[in-house]
Design a protein with these regions (language model features):
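General beta-strand structural signal in soluble alpha/beta enzymes
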Residues: 26, 60-62, 91-97, 118-121, ...
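N-terminal low-complexity or amphipathic/hydrophobic leaders
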Residues: 10, 16-74
Length: 146
């Protein structure tokens, strides 16, 4: 039997053939987070790292609670904006005209392309499989370690 799409994409990223059930370590092409990037930025600082490793591989999109329905949401948005600026993250989609639904932006802006691998903090990252994009869902407390 031939390889699955996931086996092909992960094997390409790992530089060696992989099979179902095998544990492999690969570097994702992109990591995506949305409004929950505020807790990510807090955890990032707690682990004692001053700069993100590859800011151009990060995509932050504010799309879940916009406009901010509560003071807490507004505070989270401010924390995300501050973190993005501090870290030099250029792939930031705020609630302005550049913003939108995270999954739509990932596809329309060319982050979700066939054969690439992405780790996202949203439970619907599986939708990228529709465009042959390998996706892995990570809890926001894990995404800061990727």
């Amino acid at each position: 039997m031939g390889k699955t799409f996931a086996e092909k994409a992960l094997g390409k990223a790992a530089g060696a053939p992989v099979s179902a059930g095998q544990v492999v370590i690969v570097e994702p092409h992109f990591c995506m987070s949305h409004d929950n990037a505020a807790p990510i930025s807090k955890t990032f600082k707690k682990i004692g790292v001053s700069k993100v490793w590859k800011p151009d591989n990060l995509v932050f999109i504010l799309d879940h609670a916009i406009p901010a329905p509560t003071d807490k949401h507004a505070e989270n948005h401010m924390q995300v904006r501050a973190f993005v600026k501090e870290q030099g993250i250029r792939n930031f989609y705020d609630i302005t005209s550049k913003g939108g639904v995270c999954h739509q932006i990932m596809c329309e802006e060319g982050f979700a392309l066939p054969g690439l691998i992405m780790v996202g903090s949203d439970s619907h990252t599986c939708t990228y499989g529709a465009v042959s994009y390998t996706h892995l869902r990570a809890h926001e407390t894990v995404l800061d370690l990727v």
